[in-house]
Curated annotation (Swiss-Prot):
Belongs to the class I-like SAM-binding methyltransferase superfamily. CmoB family. Catalyzes carboxymethyl transfer from carboxy-S-adenosyl-L-methionine (Cx-SAM) to 5-hydroxyuridine (ho5U) to form 5-carboxymethoxyuridine (cmo5U) at position 34 in tRNAs. Its EC number is 2.5.1.-. It catalyses: carboxy-S-adenosyl-L-methionine + 5-hydroxyuridine(34) in tRNA = 5-carboxymethoxyuridine(34) in tRNA + S-adenosyl-L-homocysteine + H(+). It is an enzyme of class 2 (transferase). Carboxy-S-adenosyl-L-methionine binds at residues 91, 105, 110, 129, 179-180, 195, 199, 314. Homotetramer. InterPro entries: CmoB, Mo5U34_MeTrfas-like, SAM-dependent_MTases_sf. This is tRNA U34 carboxymethyltransferase. Coiled coil: none annotated. The gene is cmoB. Pfam families: Methyltransf_9. Keywords: Transferase, tRNA processing.
Length: 322
């Protein structure tokens, strides 16, 4: 599997940059992770390998993720069967040669909210908690020079490799690592994204400091997370679950989040978007059949979760490393 991660191409791409030394260490680090494995990894990887060959597809990444080619119904059926072997699909949507992967999240809606506020042309980007790589492809569509994503989830890696199978030359890499697996003081990326990660961290300030370590001086952080209404002293800590999630720790107000960014050493922190998450944006589909946001909200009051807490509201902030 490791050869399909194209780590040699990543090393060539980063040659001469501050990230080259790190890139040379990745094969050994990731080989060790693959040795640890996962009980379903062989099944997921088999699904990727069953994807049919499609020469020279046409690609649209600027407006959506879409791959096109001349093909017959048999190829499309083979494509759908293989992609269904990678269910559940959380982030998307994807159009694989006419097979519409209707994911749990309408991640394209989030990208429409975030992308107008970020200049990616010619930038070297790190996407922390990149999931299946949907945003990585959209970042390339917005002009990024290259995008490295890190996420330790093996299913997400296989979903990324399903897309990479048809886009082998594009400068996007998915590493099955957590942010904590990256070296300290990496300081090699122009832009770092952390979207939908901060509220899962027991120590949010440490997360912000680790993100800053990945940035060049003058680089930009794009931070998207759950927030609540309130002033700079307002932070919600759920007693147990939040929207049925056990691993949610801190939901700050926007003002508190701006304060956290300043305390972590960022400058020019500003909020560029605040949006309530709708049941149209996150829901169960044919490609993600488990419960989703409609089941996590109070059926009598959609402004509250089933635990009686404020319904999900997400903010995007951008800040600069001085």
């Amino acid at each position: 599997m490791i050869q399909h991660l194209a780590l040699d191409a990543l090393q060539r791409h980063l040659a001469g940059s501050p990230l080259y030394g790190w890139a040379t260490s990745l094969p050994a680090q990731i080989s060790a992770r693959i040795e640890e494995g996962h009980g379903d990894l062989a099944r997921w990887w088999s699904a990727v390998q069953r994807l049919p060959q499609v020469p020279a597809p046409k690609v649209d990444l600027a407006q959506r993720f879409a791959l096109h080619s001349d093909h017959d119904a048999a190829l499309q059926a083979q494509m759908k069967e293989a992609l269904q072997g990678l269910i559940p699909w959380r982030k998307g949507p994807f159009d694989f040669f006419g097979v519409q992967v209707d994911t749990e999240w309408r991640s394209d809606w989030k990208w429409e909210r975030v992308s107008p506020h970020v200049e990616l042309r010619g930038k070297r980007v790190l996407d922390v908690g990149c999931g299946n790589g949907y945003y990585q492809w959209r970042m390339l569509g917005a002009g990024a020079e290259s995008v490295v994503g890190v996420d330790p989830n093996w299913l997400f890696l296989c979903q990324f490799l399903a897309a990479k199978r048809y886009l082998p030359e594009l400068p996007a890499w998915h590493l099955p690592l957590a942010l904590e697996d990256l070296p300290e003081k990496l300081e090699g990326f122009d832009t770092v994204f952390s979207m939908g990660v901060l509220y899962h961290r027991r120590s949010p300030i440490d997360h912000l400091l680790a993100l800053k370590d990945c940035l060049k001086r003058g680089g930009e952080l794009v931070l998207e997370t759950l927030v609540v209404e309130g002033d700079a002293s307002t932070v919600l800590v759920p007693e147990d679950r939040y929207a049925q999630m056990r691993n949610v720790w801190f939901l700050p107000s926007v003002a508190a989040l701006e304060l956290w960014l300043r305390r972590a050493g960022f400058a020019d922190a500003r909020c560029v978007d605040v949006s309530l998450t709708s049941v149209e944006e996150q829901r169960s589909t044919e490609w993600m059949r488990f419960q989703s946001l409609p089941e996590f909200l109070d059926p009598q009051d959609r402004s509250r979760t089933v635990e009686g807490l404020p319904a999900p509201m997400r903010a995007t902030l951008v800040a600069r490393k001085p």
